[in-house]
Amino acid sequence: MSLHLVDSDGHLQSEKRLKEYLTTIVAPSVSQSGSAATADDGDGDSALEAIGVNYHVVGVFGGQSSGKSTLLNHLFGTDFQTLNEAVRRGQTTKGAFIARANDALAGFEASGASVVADQLASGAADHSSCLNRAAAAAAAATKDAAYGEHGAPHTVPPLLVLDFEGTDGLERGEDQCFERQLSLFGLSIADTLIINMWAVDVGRFNAANLSLLRTIFEVNLQLFSHDNYEAEEKPTLLIVLRDFTEDDPAPSLATVRKSFDTIWEGITRPAQFAGASIDALFHLKYYVMPHYKLQKTEFMPSVETLRRWFGDSQCPDYLFSHRAMFRGVPLEGLPAYLTNCWEAIRTSKDLDIPTQREMLAQHRCKEAKVQELKTFRHFARHYEDRLLHGEMLLRLSEVLDEEMETRLASFYRQTKLYNSDVVGQYANELETELVDATLRVLNRLSKAIAAEVLSNTEPRVLNSVEESLRQLLKSAQTLPFSAGEGPSAAEAEEANDVERDAAHLVGAQRMDSPACQKLVRSFWRSLSSYVNEVVAEVAAMPPRAHLYGRYVALIAQDPTTRLNVLNIVTDALFQKVKSRVVSMADSACDTMHAGFERSLTHNSDGTARFFATTKGLQKAVPAAMQAGVVVLGSLFYFRLKLVAAGADDDGIGADVAGTALPQSRSARRVRHDQHRIVFSDNDAEAAFYLSYSTLDTAPKYPYDVPVTSADCEGEEAGAVADCILLSQQAIVRAYELYRQKCDFTTQLQLRTVEAAKQRLPAWVIPALFILGWNELLYVLTSPALLVLVVVICAVFFKQFFVSQWHAFEETGPASVVIPTKTVIHTLSTLVRSLLDYRPGPRTERTERSHDAAAAAEKEMPHVAATATHVDPTLGNANVPTAPSTMRHRTSRKLD
């Protein structure tokens, strides 16, 4: 059964029809089992895929009505239409036809050897064989291959036969365009081209159709001119001399070869073939056949002998040097290959066989990729639906990874015969899309787990921002000012206006800019450390039940999901920290003022601080204002970054690396996407800090540092525009508002201190000493009365003396205050040791102290366990500050 491959108008059969035909001739049972084989028929595709490239293609060219179809029908058992001389002589084959050779004929390996031997035993066969042995010897330019080394296969590979339209026909006239197109088409697919030539026309140009040979030489030279063309892909030209009646074929074959060389020399060749012979482009073979009518008894054995050249790999003249089709096109891809080649030929495009093979590989790989991806997505959708219904799926990643490997193996199995570079490219694309589909399902599960983890870690992370800010305020509060000229004590005493005194004292202080910038860096470093501690706890193995809740068993059994949850949690915590810092920067003035109030009303150890004198308050105001200004420097640029977590990273990766890491494709993608939160400055960011001068001027904005986008790296890297939270105008505005709020708070504090003081006139104490001198001497000279007075003062006037001592600490000179405090501390320690030293009851007191210590040790573990699970939100509670209380008291007083 033959198929009209190309009609007389140059239309090629569709890919669907070609695939149906190939399925029919390769697997007739598959075609007959259904109504028709379709392109989507799985059995038909499997039959074609099973053959792969294990087939061959033979084509025939020659003059019109030269017996081409007759030769093919006898040689291969085909049913091509032949000329009916009784009706007329003219064009019979129009375009091109394709059929499969009948491998049941004698001469093919599937036939019995005895049948072949019997048919070759006649004298006529001997005569034909002698002629062809002489023809083979005369073809000195053709290299003979030792095909006998190949073992006979168990089944004969399909042999496809192409019958092309004859040349030099009346119907086409002088139009050789279609002839050239068919020649190029035949060379693009056929392993062997049979040139059908009459023996009596040897030595002639037109009668021997040497113009056809010239066309074949030119188009094959065109194919070979491409740089990526493979030199070993040379087609075989089998010149068959028909109706040969002479005894010695050598003179005729020498004439044919000379004609070939003449044509070759007359062709314009590229530089790489300038000195090459025709053997560089073709394997030349020759065969002579007796007269079809006059030597009928010799003609048929000659046909059977020639058939062995095509069907018997043990034959010395076997034409196919490889079992595979020499173009390397799998049979299931042949329809697409023929379509692409014919389209390029018909549109006068440059036909590049390697490019066509690559296009075919792309087409086939794309089909296989789409099919496997569709199958995997259908498989994954089942598990995704189960997750939507709330099921908890253990080892989900392992199931998806196994199916992914199955799909990839199926893809490689379908495309193993195509261009390896193209297959590798599409395999990478398929792997990427399969991993994306896998992670899409895993993300649905991981996000639910991450939400549970975030609900347990978010308060701690947000509290870490507050804790880092408290540490910053504590360090900034104790940061000394640079040496500078300040107001003298006399000038401060002479100031009558409290507001002017406070402003003058504040403005005179000069800040240590490098030290302040160092505090800013310590703030971000501390914040990064706090957040990474939380992330490390999330990554720890075994998973923590107080973090994962009901998912703890699932996480313990699914390492890939655990890594994915860790990535989601890390990214989410980073965004939450950034959101918190951004909100603090949006209200920078309030954040600075809160830091000022805390520094003013709390000591460096966190205890509340109260002022007894206005001078002590004025001394504390500059340090508190400096703390707020340092907070401004910390908020104007976000300095944490999400960077890729390397395999040798410590911290987060240590806990993960301590366990067996999964090696699946999805796990490698998850590990590749893993990040860690770090504080790091590039060269530009290291200089992108506010510069501080004095408290009465706003910090200087770093204008000299370049600002770039986040994707700039290397030498172009600068401060990232998205990380700048405050502009120069925003900094100045926040600073001015901060100064106003600090001045107002300082006024309230000063008024509160002034209102709380109980002052006596300066002349009262000297008057008491003068007027009560006799009474004072009487008390001093009477021991009993002196003891009574001391006891009364200690009991009833203790708070008065303590307040006076605090006032002395705040207002007294440091040269007197510090030695006095040292002496008092030493005396109190000595007195305490003397009181504890008692000979009698010492043992009893020691036992009581030991019992108290033991009781404390018993209570400590319980206290520690409670602290571990205490509500993190309690850490955000703020102790009411003194300024608020004083503000309310002042308002009531004004009312």
Curated annotation (Swiss-Prot):
Matching Gene3D superfamilies: P-loop containing nucleotide triphosphate hydrolases
Keyword line: Endoplasmic reticulum, GTP-binding, Hydrolase, Membrane, Nucleotide-binding, Transmembrane, Transmembrane helix
Domain GB1/RHD3-type G per the UniProt entry, residue ranges: 52-323
Superkingdom of origin organism: Eukaryota
CDD domains: GBP (cd01851)
Annotated residues for binding of GTP: G62, G63, Q64, S65, S66, G67, K68, S69
Name of this protein: Protein SEY1 homolog
Enzyme nomenclature, EC number: 3.6.5.-
Segments on the Lumenal face: 781-783
Annotated organism of origin: Leishmania infantum
Enzyme class: hydrolase
Alphabetized InterPro entries for the sequence: G_GB1_RHD3_dom, P-loop_NTPase, RHD3/Sey1, Sey1/RHD3-like_3HB
Location, primary (coarse class): endoplasmic reticulum
Cytoplasmic side: 1-759, 805-895
Role: Probable GTP-binding protein that may be involved in cell development.
Membrane as UniProt keyword: yes
Basic residues bias (residue ranges): 886-895
Subcellular location: Endoplasmic reticulum membrane
Taxonomy of the source species: Eukaryota, Discoba, Euglenozoa, Kinetoplastea, Metakinetoplastina
Similarity-based family: Belongs to the TRAFAC class dynamin-like GTPase superfamily. GB1/RHD3 GTPase family. RHD3 subfamily.
